[in-house]
């Protein structure tokens, strides 16, 4: 049984503030874990009546996720789909480090923070692109794209046709600030805020704003 933590209400409010009062949007949350702990979209779904697709490949979180959230997809996301791909699970911290391709600097970060790690499990998971999931769940539009995939953000973004969907806001969890700035700039996105480890991007906002 993993430990649960409070939802990320501060970031949820930042998102809500970008839309008209009472707006009920459509969003996808890639890397949703249990759907509650430090989760950005829980508040949107439960208190603002947004429609959110919660995506998570780790089976440990699945039972809690389906209890917490209305729409759930058990898979990983990447630039291309696959019926079976190795997913690496950090046995010391399933939520913060597990990924299709774990970043090599995690071990260095853990050593710096005094955390004993180097314990990894591996499972096979289904992989889908964001485009495939939006089509499967018949999204009429996409207002919010949230991605928390431990260093694989660009690969996941490449699986979403941003020119077609044009989400108003994109939230990327990233240890380092601005790692997706250049990639998203070509689609008209500007990073407007940094909330703890989350980069927040808006569509069509001038860079100097």
Task: Map each language-model feature to its residues.
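Phosphate/nucleotide-binding beta-alpha loop and adjacent structural elements of enzyme active sites
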Residues: 1-209
């Amino acid at each position: 049984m993993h430990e649960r933590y409070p939802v990320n209400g501060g970031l949820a409010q930042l998102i809500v503030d970008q839309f008209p009062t009472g707006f009920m949007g459509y969003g996808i949350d890639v890397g949703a874990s249990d759907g509650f702990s430090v989760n950005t979209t829980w508040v949107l779904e439960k208190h603002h009546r947004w429609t959110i697709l919660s995506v998570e490949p780790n089976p440990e979180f699945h039972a809690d996720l389906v209890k917490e959230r209305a729409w759930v997809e058990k898979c990983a996301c990447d630039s291309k789909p696959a019926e079976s791909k190795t997913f690496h699970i950090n046995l010391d911290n399933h939520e913060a480090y597990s990924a299709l391709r774990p970043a090599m600097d995690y071990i260095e970060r853990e050593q710096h923070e005094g955390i004993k790690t180097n314990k990894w499990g591996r499972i096979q998971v289904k992989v889908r692109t964001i485009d495939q999931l939006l089509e499967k769940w018949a999204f009429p539009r996409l207002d919010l794209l949230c991605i928390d995939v431990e260093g694989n953000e660009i690969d996941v973004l490449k699986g979403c046709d941003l020119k077609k969907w044009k989400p108003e806001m994109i939230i990327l969890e990233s240890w380092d600030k601005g790692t997706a700035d250049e990639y998203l700039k070509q689609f008209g996105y500007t990073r407007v805020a940094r909330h703890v480890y989350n980069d927040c991007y808006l569509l069509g906002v001038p860079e100097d704003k």
